[in-house]
Amino acid sequence: MGKDFFFYRLYVYSNIMKIGLVMNVKLLKNLAFLGLLSFSVFPSFALSKIIPDGTIPYNMGVQLKGDTDGPEDLDRVQELGMKWVRRGFIWESIEREKGVYDFSQYDRFVNDCEKRGLKIIGCMAFSNKLYGHVKDEPARSAYADFAAELVKHYKGRNIIWEIWNEPNTMTFWGRHGKVGNSPQYAREYTDLVRAAVPAMKKANPDCVILAGSVSNMWSESYKWMSYCFADGMLDIHWDIWSVHPYGVKAPEDYMEAYSHTRNLMKKAGGDTGRLWINSERGFPLGKAEGYAGGDPSLAYEYQAWHVIRQYLVDLLEGLPVTIWYEWGGKEGFAL
């Protein structure tokens, strides 16, 4: 019953999205009337062309991976009503020989997305064994070169570029430190952003760059962001700060988490009106009991509720894009 069950769930999610969008429209109208809702101001023309201004449903998307990015999956994503996809652009798969870049496998994906009107968050990941870890030279400069080649090659396409995935964690930044969310990890990541952003802007002045990609919204990740801000992160000319709001049981709790993060930026002397994106948030079906909360037998219902509630929260908080993790896969998060 695999395919039939998928389309049944697709039908259910489509109706959930429709219900949620109606709720959003009514809620947004009421809040706008009350003067409680503030819309983002775009800092550049290039940014305003690709990032929606809060128009429903043009700011909802889903995470894809290499085994779920084919035409059939993209057709289903489009049918569900999503307008964005997030996917890794893996450095090692593009630069297998120093200084030689092969974009062919990603060209197909970008073209397929473009045909379906899907915009892309391209996560530029990870270190390359040709150079070593990006915390050190020459890998840091080589990553900046790779990022510059990416934005040059895909200039004019509907892609925004995220520097790394969850660099505050040992899982994705490395186990050379004793613990994640450390001052060391913050300093190393800030140095990478400091190297990559000027190279990218030189190669393509109109490219849109996301920094942060922060995993979880809790005390330790707040500390990590503060370390980044203290190291000069807010002085670098990236365009959008991206977060992955995991760590609490109810999406509504992220309103307080977002507020706290804005206060951290303000305390560090940063622009609290700078754009944000939720570039990853999911609900684990296989772990419904625990940090996600809820009865495992109701996992699918809880996941559906979380999709809509997270989307509503992000809209209310002025986040112009929400990416749901994930479309498929075996981690237990798949829609």
Regions found by a protein language model. Name each.
Residues 73-76, 80-234, 245-248:
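Substrate-binding cleft and catalytic face of glycoside hydrolase catalytic domains
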Residues 282-335:
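Aromatic/acidic polysaccharide-binding cleft in carbohydrate-active enzymes
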